[in-house]
Swiss-Prot record:
Compartments, record wording: Cytoplasm
Protein role: Specifically methylates the N7 position of guanine in position 527 of 16S rRNA.
One annotated GO molecular function: rRNA (guanine-N7-)-methyltransferase activity
rRNA processing is among the record's keywords: yes
Originating organism: Xanthomonas campestris pv. campestris (strain ATCC 33913 / DSM 3586 / NCPPB 528 / LMG 568 / P 25)
Protein name: Ribosomal RNA small subunit methyltransferase G
Length: 212
């Protein structure tokens, strides 16, 4: 499948979404190449439950990119990234960011390696492992997790990867009052940003948790 094989309104939906998120239109081409590869592999390997490319634009690409204003540079570990979400869209739009895509599922890890090769994306790499097994203590400025666990659960499996003073950026739906109240000692919420994802109804919040 090439980009032209995607439904004709997919490109327009992505272009409109990038504009709404104040992102450069030049990012559309690599994002569409990634989407095309994801659609193709998903038919065989079931990488995501979302099947419709139009829905993938909203629920995968634009949702991932909603956190982009809050991560500028440095090192980032994306925990339980699945097929590379949000890590690959962030690596595309933030070339100064060094992204490690942490995923234990072999099919998803193979897909991501092919995607990085296909996109010639030199600022990202795949770590095929569970987050708790990645032996890189205090190596990262940022952690992300889009659909992995509660805040305390994310910290339990991946908190060792974050340097002191670093930040965990966790995507949540409604404001997670109970999860924030259950944070372990040594971790504190810095900010909670309401997110607007073009085309997506429902609440989205980005919770930024700092490691003391």
């Amino acid at each position: 499948m090439n980009d032209a094989a995607l439904p004709p309104d997919v490109s327009a939906a992505l272009a409109n979404g990038l504009q709404a998120q104040s992102l450069d239109a030049d990012f559309a081409a690599p994002l569409l190449r990634y989407l095309t590869l994801l659609v193709r592999w998903n038919k065989t390997y079931n990488l995501t439950a979302v099947r419709d490319p139009r829905e993938m634009v909203t629920r995968h690409l634009l949702d991932s990119l909603a956190m982009q204003p809050y991560i500028v540079s440095g090192t980032l570990a994306d925990l339980g990234t699945g097929p590379g979400l949000p890590g690959i869209p962030l690596a595309i739009t933030r070339p100064q960011l060094q992204v490690t895509l942490v995923e234990s599922n072999g099919k998803k890890a193979r897909f991501m390696r092919e995607a990085l090769r296909h996109l010639a994306l030199g600022n990202a790499r795949v770590a095929e492992a569970r987050a708790e097994a990645v032996d890189e203590p205090a190596a990262y400025d940022h952690l992300t997790a889009r659909a992995l666990d509660t805040l305390a659960g994310i910290i339990a499996v991946g908190g060792h990867l974050l340097r002191p003073g670093g930040s965990l950026l966790a995507m949540k739906g409604v404001y997670p009052h109970e999860e924030i109240a259950a944070l372990p000692a040594g971790w504190r919420v810095g900010e909670v940003h309401p997110l607007q994802v073009p085309g997506l109804d429902g609440e989205r919040h980005l919770v930024v948790v700092h490691k003391d």
